[in-house]
Amino acid sequence: MHPRPMFARYFVEVPLSPEAVAHALARDPRVWLPGLAERANHGGDLLLAEVGFGDVVRIKRTVVVELGDSVRSGSTIVFPLRWVASSGAGLFPSLDADLEVAPLGPGRTQLAMSARYVPPFGSVGRVIDRAALSRVAEATLKDFLDRVADTILMASREASRPSEHGGAGVRLHEAG
């Protein structure tokens, strides 16, 4: 019997066109996405400590985030995303998600993340997940997506300002 996945979803509105958001997401994601995931992951670790899982937090872990090529489905652009712990992998679930870019109207986009993960430790892990860890996963997902949206907005603002050389320039980097 295969373990049943848990689901989490979060979305944020971005005051940019879907094309601008999708372009920003696809622009060097290996450069800027991992840092955002690390920060969101750290926030999740702090929440784990608050709900009584301090021993888990003491395990130093980093995450690897992979963003796949986009696929268009009607007016929605979907990027497959995978988030895995690069250390302590058996203690932490991997997360598979769809990062969705959908129009909300002129110059407005819904950036959403629909995620699936299987809690570690079988049926015991599912009970623990229902008791507290699912809320930590949701908070981490929210933190990550908010950081992605902030980074895209910051890059858009930088692109609209003239650079020193007379043209507009944009560079995606991690938002604080």
Question: Could you say what each language-model-derived stretch is?
Answer:
Residues 118-176:
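A conserved amphipathic terminal alpha-helix motif
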Residues 20, 89, 119-121:
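Residue-level signal for secondary-structure boundary sites
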Residues 1-56, 70, 176:
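Hydrophobic ligand-binding cavity/cleft-lining segments
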Residues 33-41, 52-108, 116:
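Hydrophobic-ligand binding "helix-grip"
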